[in-house]
Structure formats: C-alpha cells, structure tokens
Amino acid sequence: NVVPKNLTFKEKLKIPGVFLVLVMFLSYCSLESIGTNWVSSYYVAVKGLNSALAATFGSLFFIGITTSRLISGFITEKLGDKKMIILGMVFILLGIILLVIPNVNYYVSVVGFIICGMGAGPIYPAIVHSTPDNFGKENSQGIIGLQMAFAYIGSTFTPLLFGLISSALGIEILPFCFLFFLIIFCVLFIFLQKKLKKSKNIK
C-alpha cells in the first residue's frame, strides 16, 4: 500500500511538471466550459438559428464529450494516456478548422462543435489517470486535488470572462477562443513531456 505524502501547496508546486499540468487543466476546462455555456448562443447570433434549434444543436457538443469519454474508457489501456491526449488535441483542431471556414452552412458548424466535443472528452480523464505515473503514487492524491481546484477555476470564471469579451468583440470569436486555449494546452503539454523526461532521467 502506498502512503500518500502530506505535502503543502508550495511543496506540490516544486514537483517538476506540476505547475504545467495545473495550467493545462485550467486551459482545457476553460475551453470545455466556454463550449458548454456559449455554443447555443453562437448558433443564434452567428448562424441565425432559433433558440429551440440552437439549444438542441448546442447539446451535441456535450454529447460529443460524453460519447468520446465512454469510448476512451475502452481504448485508453491500449493507446495510453499520452496518445489519448494527443488524439484529443487533433480532434479539437479539426473541429476548429470546420468552425472558422467562412460563410459555411450551419450543419458544418454543428459537425465542427461535435468533433471539438469528442476531442475534449478523453483529455480530462487522461490527465487525471496519468498523475500517479507522472508524479508518483505517493504524491498523486494531493496533486489530483489541485487539478480539480484549477479545473473549477477555469470552469467557473472563463465563461464569465468570455461573456464580457464577446459583448465587446462579438460571439463569433468563440472558435478563436477554442484555438487560443488549445495552443496554450499544446505548448504546455510539450514542455510537460520534456520536464517529465528530464526528471525521470535524473532519477
């Protein structure tokens, strides 16, 4: 049995890669929460759909997340957490490409958001599942707690911030906000892999 270490907040942050993964979590949850809260409004304002149809199509983003998490539960053991995260990022990027095509039919946007949702689905559980391997089983309990805290920060405040920004710039910036958070996540993911590799080589 592994005895969890009772580390302070500062001690957890000193573990190589922990700060990076926390900001990754915040970035991912920011993307997911913006999609969950604002996709329906995007359909109304940008694609001209009525509220009922927009709400129906908006729910497909969340269904995409749920479906892909169900599927990932069966294939994660075969592919591994790292490949699942990379696959998720690729799917999100493909979805964004569909969303930024100018003057496109709203059906293409629906497909784009579904693909983004499917890409987002496996990322959250994959990061959590990889925590013991990345930072040690004895540290994982405390670090996962921090991950949840940063996840809630992103989920709570980013949709509010997006609402303020979109009121000034227009809600059509939503796909570009997706891209913004995806780029942050990708860059941090690359640095995290280098940091973890260096840490393991030292050990």
Language-model-detected regions and their locations in the chain:
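Extracytoplasmic gate region of multi-pass secondary transporters
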Residues: 16-59, 63-66
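Paired small-residue
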Residues: 95, 107-115
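Juxtamembrane intracellular "pre-TM" segments in multi-pass secondary transporters
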Residues: 1-21
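Structural signature of the two symmetry-related core transmembrane helices
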Residues: 83-97
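Multi-pass alpha-helical transporter architecture, strongest
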Residues: 179-203
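A late C-terminal transmembrane helix in Major Facilitator Superfamily
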Residues: 132-171
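Intracellular juxtamembrane helix-capping segments at the cytosolic ends
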Residues: 122-135
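Helix-to-loop junctions at the C-terminal end of transmembrane segments
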Residues: 69-80, 166
